[in-house]
Protein backbone atom coordinates (compact mmCIF):
# COMPACT_ATOMS: atom_id res chain seq x y z
CA UNK A 1 0.00 0.00 0.00
CA UNK A 2 1.29 3.46 -0.87
CA UNK A 3 1.24 6.01 1.94
CA UNK A 4 0.64 9.57 0.78
CA UNK A 5 2.70 12.12 2.69
CA UNK A 6 1.04 15.49 3.14
CA UNK A 7 3.31 18.42 2.37
CA UNK A 8 2.41 20.95 5.06
CA UNK A 9 4.07 24.25 4.07
CA UNK A 10 5.98 25.34 7.19
CA UNK A 11 2.95 24.22 9.22
CA UNK A 12 1.23 27.33 7.89
CA UNK A 13 2.88 30.12 9.90
CA UNK A 14 0.66 32.44 11.91
CA UNK A 15 -0.18 35.09 10.83
CA UNK A 16 -0.99 33.52 7.50
CA UNK A 17 1.76 33.83 4.90
CA UNK A 18 0.95 30.66 2.95
CA UNK A 19 -1.81 30.81 0.38
CA UNK A 20 -4.05 27.76 0.36
CA UNK A 21 -5.65 27.25 -3.04
CA UNK A 22 -8.91 25.34 -3.22
CA UNK A 23 -7.09 22.65 -5.23
CA UNK A 24 -4.47 22.26 -2.50
CA UNK A 25 -7.13 21.96 0.19
CA UNK A 26 -9.17 19.56 -1.93
CA UNK A 27 -6.06 17.37 -2.22
CA UNK A 28 -5.95 17.18 1.57
CA UNK A 29 -9.58 16.05 1.63
CA UNK A 30 -8.70 13.26 -0.79
CA UNK A 31 -5.94 11.88 1.42
CA UNK A 32 -6.70 8.36 2.76
CA UNK A 33 -8.85 8.84 5.85
CA UNK A 34 -6.61 7.36 8.56
CA UNK A 35 -3.50 8.99 7.10
CA UNK A 36 -5.26 12.36 7.10
CA UNK A 37 -6.31 11.98 10.75
CA UNK A 38 -2.77 10.90 11.68
CA UNK A 39 -1.20 13.92 9.98
CA UNK A 40 -3.71 16.27 11.60
CA UNK A 41 -3.01 14.75 15.02
CA UNK A 42 0.71 15.41 14.54
CA UNK A 43 0.08 19.05 13.67
CA UNK A 44 -2.23 19.38 16.68
CA UNK A 45 0.44 18.12 19.07
CA UNK A 46 2.98 20.66 17.83
CA UNK A 47 0.81 23.54 19.01
CA UNK A 48 -1.60 22.32 21.70
CA UNK A 49 -1.85 20.03 24.68
CA UNK A 50 -3.77 17.09 23.14
CA UNK A 51 -5.29 16.16 26.51
CA UNK A 52 -7.21 19.42 27.03
CA UNK A 53 -10.44 20.81 25.57
CA UNK A 54 -11.42 24.47 25.69
CA UNK A 55 -15.00 24.78 26.99
CA UNK A 56 -17.30 27.60 25.88
CA UNK A 57 -20.95 28.24 26.68
CA UNK A 58 -23.23 29.94 24.15
CA UNK A 59 -26.35 31.85 25.16
CA UNK A 60 -28.97 33.50 22.97
CA UNK A 61 -29.45 36.98 24.41
CA UNK A 62 -31.90 38.08 21.69
CA UNK A 63 -33.88 35.35 19.96
CA UNK A 64 -35.83 35.08 16.69
CA UNK A 65 -37.30 37.66 14.34
CA UNK A 66 -34.16 38.03 12.23
CA UNK A 67 -34.83 39.62 8.80
CA UNK A 68 -32.10 37.57 7.08
CA UNK A 69 -32.98 34.54 4.94
CA UNK A 70 -30.18 32.12 5.95
CA UNK A 71 -31.49 28.74 4.75
CA UNK A 72 -30.19 26.90 7.81
CA UNK A 73 -31.48 29.24 10.52
CA UNK A 74 -34.64 28.64 12.58
CA UNK A 75 -34.42 32.22 13.88
CA UNK A 76 -35.24 33.80 10.52
CA UNK A 77 -38.57 35.67 10.53
CA UNK A 78 -39.19 34.25 7.05
CA UNK A 79 -39.63 30.66 8.23
CA UNK A 80 -42.20 28.96 10.46
CA UNK A 81 -40.05 26.96 12.86
CA UNK A 82 -41.78 27.45 16.19
CA UNK A 83 -39.01 29.65 17.61
CA UNK A 84 -40.45 32.20 20.03
CA UNK A 85 -39.17 35.75 19.52
CA UNK A 86 -37.48 37.29 22.54
CA UNK A 87 -36.09 40.80 22.88
CA UNK A 88 -32.64 41.53 24.29
CA UNK A 89 -32.44 40.04 27.78
CA UNK A 90 -31.63 42.12 30.85
CA UNK A 91 -28.10 42.22 32.25
CA UNK A 92 -29.05 40.41 35.46
CA UNK A 93 -30.49 37.38 33.66
CA UNK A 94 -27.43 37.04 31.42
CA UNK A 95 -25.00 37.39 34.33
CA UNK A 96 -26.85 34.66 36.23
CA UNK A 97 -26.43 32.28 33.28
CA UNK A 98 -22.76 33.25 33.00
CA UNK A 99 -22.20 32.44 36.68
CA UNK A 100 -23.72 28.99 36.17
CA UNK A 101 -21.54 28.41 33.09
CA UNK A 102 -18.41 29.33 35.02
CA UNK A 103 -19.34 27.09 37.94
CA UNK A 104 -19.63 24.17 35.49
CA UNK A 105 -16.18 24.67 34.00
CA UNK A 106 -16.69 27.04 31.06
CA UNK A 107 -13.84 29.46 30.48
CA UNK A 108 -15.56 31.52 27.81
CA UNK A 109 -19.10 32.88 27.66
CA UNK A 110 -20.46 33.51 24.17
CA UNK A 111 -23.51 35.64 23.50
CA UNK A 112 -25.57 35.61 20.31
CA UNK A 113 -28.21 38.03 19.07
CA UNK A 114 -30.53 37.27 16.15
CA UNK A 115 -30.52 40.36 13.98
CA UNK A 116 -28.82 41.50 10.78
CA UNK A 117 -26.69 43.82 12.84
CA UNK A 118 -27.00 45.92 16.00
CA UNK A 119 -28.18 49.50 16.10
CA UNK A 120 -26.26 52.11 18.15
CA UNK A 121 -28.82 51.81 20.99
CA UNK A 122 -28.24 48.04 21.05
CA UNK A 123 -24.49 48.53 21.38
CA UNK A 124 -25.05 50.61 24.52
CA UNK A 125 -26.88 47.69 26.15
CA UNK A 126 -24.43 45.09 24.86
CA UNK A 127 -21.39 46.91 26.23
CA UNK A 128 -23.04 46.96 29.65
CA UNK A 129 -23.61 43.20 29.41
CA UNK A 130 -20.00 42.55 28.33
CA UNK A 131 -18.60 44.51 31.27
CA UNK A 132 -20.77 42.58 33.73
CA UNK A 133 -19.74 39.18 32.33
CA UNK A 134 -16.06 40.18 32.25
CA UNK A 135 -16.30 41.07 35.94
CA UNK A 136 -16.95 37.36 36.59
CA UNK A 137 -13.49 36.48 35.26
CA UNK A 138 -14.76 34.86 32.05
CA UNK A 139 -13.54 35.40 28.51
CA UNK A 140 -16.29 36.97 26.42
CA UNK A 141 -17.36 36.36 22.84
CA UNK A 142 -20.16 38.02 20.91
CA UNK A 143 -21.96 37.18 17.69
CA UNK A 144 -24.05 40.21 16.84
CA UNK A 145 -24.06 40.30 13.03
CA UNK A 146 -22.82 42.98 10.64
CA UNK A 147 -21.15 45.91 12.41
CA UNK A 148 -21.29 49.58 11.52
CA UNK A 149 -18.16 51.76 11.69
CA UNK A 150 -16.94 52.31 15.25
CA UNK A 151 -18.98 49.51 16.83
CA UNK A 152 -16.10 47.04 17.02
CA UNK A 153 -14.04 49.62 18.90
CA UNK A 154 -16.87 50.12 21.41
CA UNK A 155 -17.10 46.36 21.98
CA UNK A 156 -13.34 46.13 22.44
CA UNK A 157 -13.35 49.00 24.94
CA UNK A 158 -16.11 47.26 26.92
CA UNK A 159 -13.86 44.21 27.29
CA UNK A 160 -15.05 41.85 24.55
CA UNK A 161 -12.34 39.28 23.79
CA UNK A 162 -13.67 37.49 20.69
CA UNK A 163 -16.09 38.42 17.94
CA UNK A 164 -17.78 35.52 16.16
CA UNK A 165 -18.66 36.13 12.54
CA UNK A 166 -18.85 32.95 10.47
CA UNK A 167 -18.41 33.00 6.70
CA UNK A 168 -20.96 30.16 6.59
CA UNK A 169 -19.87 28.38 3.39
CA UNK A 170 -17.64 28.68 0.33
CA UNK A 171 -17.96 31.89 -1.72
CA UNK A 172 -19.17 29.81 -4.69
CA UNK A 173 -21.97 28.25 -2.63
CA UNK A 174 -22.98 31.38 -0.72
CA UNK A 175 -25.93 32.50 -2.84
CA UNK A 176 -27.42 29.00 -2.59
CA UNK A 177 -27.68 29.49 1.17
CA UNK A 178 -28.17 33.22 1.79
CA UNK A 179 -29.68 35.91 -0.42
CA UNK A 180 -29.94 38.89 1.94
CA UNK A 181 -26.20 39.52 2.23
CA UNK A 182 -23.01 38.87 0.28
CA UNK A 183 -19.88 36.94 1.18
CA UNK A 184 -18.01 40.26 1.06
CA UNK A 185 -20.35 41.68 3.73
CA UNK A 186 -18.94 39.09 6.13
CA UNK A 187 -15.36 39.93 5.19
CA UNK A 188 -16.08 43.63 5.68
CA UNK A 189 -17.18 43.11 9.29
CA UNK A 190 -14.24 40.77 9.94
CA UNK A 191 -11.94 43.56 8.78
CA UNK A 192 -13.54 45.99 11.24
CA UNK A 193 -13.18 43.46 14.04
CA UNK A 194 -9.48 42.90 13.33
CA UNK A 195 -8.81 46.63 13.02
CA UNK A 196 -10.33 47.16 16.48
CA UNK A 197 -7.93 44.59 17.96
CA UNK A 198 -10.52 41.92 18.77
CA UNK A 199 -9.75 38.22 18.41
CA UNK A 200 -11.69 36.52 15.64
CA UNK A 201 -13.91 33.46 15.91
CA UNK A 202 -14.82 32.49 12.35
CA UNK A 203 -15.92 29.21 10.85
CA UNK A 204 -18.75 27.71 8.86
CA UNK A 205 -21.36 25.00 8.42
CA UNK A 206 -21.05 21.74 6.51
CA UNK A 207 -23.83 19.44 5.37
CA UNK A 208 -25.73 22.13 3.42
CA UNK A 209 -25.77 20.16 0.16
CA UNK A 210 -22.35 21.52 -0.74
CA UNK A 211 -19.83 19.49 -2.74
CA UNK A 212 -16.48 18.38 -1.34
CA UNK A 213 -14.85 21.06 -3.50
CA UNK A 214 -17.09 23.64 -1.85
CA UNK A 215 -16.12 22.32 1.59
CA UNK A 216 -12.52 22.78 0.48
CA UNK A 217 -13.45 26.32 -0.59
CA UNK A 218 -14.81 27.07 2.87
CA UNK A 219 -11.62 25.87 4.58
CA UNK A 220 -9.40 27.67 2.06
CA UNK A 221 -11.29 30.92 2.67
CA UNK A 222 -10.79 30.56 6.43
CA UNK A 223 -7.13 29.55 6.16
CA UNK A 224 -6.35 32.52 3.91
CA UNK A 225 -7.69 35.09 6.35
CA UNK A 226 -4.71 37.15 7.50
CA UNK A 227 -4.15 36.64 10.32
CA UNK A 228 -5.94 33.34 10.67
CA UNK A 229 -8.87 33.18 13.13
CA UNK A 230 -7.94 32.39 16.70
CA UNK A 231 -11.03 30.18 16.89
CA UNK A 232 -12.63 28.17 14.06
CA UNK A 233 -16.07 26.68 14.82
CA UNK A 234 -17.02 23.85 12.46
CA UNK A 235 -20.78 23.27 12.56
CA UNK A 236 -22.65 20.27 11.23
CA UNK A 237 -26.02 21.39 9.91
CA UNK A 238 -28.84 20.91 12.40
CA UNK A 239 -31.85 20.32 10.18
CA UNK A 240 -34.88 22.20 11.51
CA UNK A 241 -38.40 21.68 10.19
CA UNK A 242 -39.60 24.81 8.42
CA UNK A 243 -36.20 25.91 7.10
CA UNK A 244 -35.26 25.42 3.43
CA UNK A 245 -32.50 22.98 4.45
CA UNK A 246 -34.75 20.75 6.55
CA UNK A 247 -34.38 17.97 3.98
CA UNK A 248 -30.70 18.46 3.18
CA UNK A 249 -28.75 15.35 2.24
CA UNK A 250 -27.06 13.71 5.23
CA UNK A 251 -23.30 14.24 5.39
CA UNK A 252 -21.31 11.06 6.01
CA UNK A 253 -19.58 11.16 9.39
CA UNK A 254 -16.16 10.52 7.86
CA UNK A 255 -16.53 13.63 5.71
CA UNK A 256 -17.15 15.73 8.80
CA UNK A 257 -14.04 14.28 10.49
CA UNK A 258 -12.08 15.01 7.30
CA UNK A 259 -13.24 18.63 7.52
CA UNK A 260 -11.95 18.86 11.11
CA UNK A 261 -8.61 17.33 10.09
CA UNK A 262 -8.17 19.66 7.12
CA UNK A 263 -9.04 22.67 9.29
CA UNK A 264 -6.39 21.59 11.80
CA UNK A 265 -3.69 21.13 9.15
CA UNK A 266 -4.38 24.43 7.39
CA UNK A 267 -4.88 26.44 10.61
CA UNK A 268 -2.50 24.77 13.09
CA UNK A 269 -2.57 27.46 15.78
CA UNK A 270 -6.32 28.04 15.77
CA UNK A 271 -8.73 26.43 18.20
CA UNK A 272 -10.94 24.14 16.11
CA UNK A 273 -14.33 23.90 17.77
CA UNK A 274 -16.95 21.19 17.45
CA UNK A 275 -20.01 23.42 17.36
CA UNK A 276 -23.60 22.80 16.29
CA UNK A 277 -24.63 19.25 15.47
CA UNK A 278 -22.85 17.39 18.28
CA UNK A 279 -26.19 16.12 19.59
CA UNK A 280 -26.40 13.89 16.53
CA UNK A 281 -22.81 12.60 16.80
CA UNK A 282 -21.87 9.35 18.48
CA UNK A 283 -19.18 9.30 21.16
CA UNK A 284 -16.95 7.46 18.70
CA UNK A 285 -17.38 10.16 16.06
CA UNK A 286 -16.58 12.90 18.56
CA UNK A 287 -13.50 10.99 19.70
CA UNK A 288 -12.30 10.83 16.09
CA UNK A 289 -12.84 14.58 15.78
CA UNK A 290 -10.68 15.17 18.86
CA UNK A 291 -8.05 12.85 17.40
CA UNK A 292 -8.20 14.86 14.16
CA UNK A 293 -7.49 18.12 15.95
CA UNK A 294 -10.71 19.50 17.41
CA UNK A 295 -9.88 21.02 20.79
CA UNK A 296 -12.89 23.08 21.77
CA UNK A 297 -16.61 22.45 22.28
CA UNK A 298 -19.71 24.38 23.19
CA UNK A 299 -20.64 23.16 26.65
CA UNK A 300 -24.25 23.34 27.81
CA UNK A 301 -27.61 21.85 26.88
CA UNK A 302 -28.47 24.49 24.26
CA UNK A 303 -26.80 26.25 21.33
CA UNK A 304 -28.90 29.37 20.77
CA UNK A 305 -32.18 27.57 19.93
CA UNK A 306 -30.92 24.07 19.05
CA UNK A 307 -30.22 21.12 21.34
CA UNK A 308 -26.67 20.37 22.51
CA UNK A 309 -25.40 17.34 24.48
CA UNK A 310 -26.09 17.61 28.21
CA UNK A 311 -23.16 18.66 30.38
CA UNK A 312 -23.18 15.36 32.31
CA UNK A 313 -22.79 13.51 29.02
CA UNK A 314 -19.87 15.70 27.99
CA UNK A 315 -18.17 15.19 31.34
CA UNK A 316 -18.58 11.43 30.99
CA UNK A 317 -17.19 11.44 27.46
CA UNK A 318 -14.21 13.57 28.48
CA UNK A 319 -13.51 11.19 31.36
CA UNK A 320 -13.62 8.19 29.00
CA UNK A 321 -11.14 9.91 26.69
CA UNK A 322 -8.93 11.21 29.55
CA UNK A 323 -9.55 14.79 28.42
CA UNK A 324 -9.61 17.74 30.81
CA UNK A 325 -11.01 21.27 30.50
CA UNK A 326 -8.35 23.71 29.38
CA UNK A 327 -7.09 26.15 32.03
CA UNK A 328 -4.28 28.69 32.08
CA UNK A 329 -2.17 26.10 33.93
CA UNK A 330 -2.56 23.15 31.55
CA UNK A 331 -2.49 24.88 28.14
UniProtKB/Swiss-Prot annotation:
Residues bound to [4Fe-4S] cluster: 66, 70, 73
Record InterPro entries: Aldolase_TIM, BATS_dom, Biotin_synth/BioAB, Biotin_synthase, Elp3/MiaA/NifB-like_rSAM, rSAM
Gene3D superfamilies in the record: Aldolase class I (3.20.20.70)
UniProt-listed GO biological process terms: biotin biosynthetic process
Pathway annotation from the record: Cofactor biosynthesis; biotin biosynthesis; biotin from 7,8-diaminononanoate: step 2/2
Reactions it catalyzes: (4R,5S)-dethiobiotin + (sulfur carrier)-SH + 2 reduced [2Fe-2S]-[ferredoxin] + 2 S-adenosyl-L-methionine = (sulfur carrier)-H + biotin + 2 5'-deoxyadenosine + 2 L-methionine + 2 oxidized [2Fe-2S]-[ferredoxin]
NCBIfam families assigned to the protein according to its UniProt record, in alphabetical order: bioB
Protein name, per record: Biotin synthase
Gene name of the record: bioB
Amino acid sequence: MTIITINIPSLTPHPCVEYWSVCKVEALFETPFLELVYQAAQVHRKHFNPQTIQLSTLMSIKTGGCPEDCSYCPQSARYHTGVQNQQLLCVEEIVEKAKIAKSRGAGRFCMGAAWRGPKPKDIEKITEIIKAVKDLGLETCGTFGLLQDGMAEELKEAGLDYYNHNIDTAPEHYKEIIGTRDFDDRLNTLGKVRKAGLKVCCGGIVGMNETRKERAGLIASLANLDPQPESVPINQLVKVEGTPLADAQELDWTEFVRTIAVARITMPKSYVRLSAGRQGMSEEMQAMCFMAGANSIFYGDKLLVTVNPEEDGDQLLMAKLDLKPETQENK
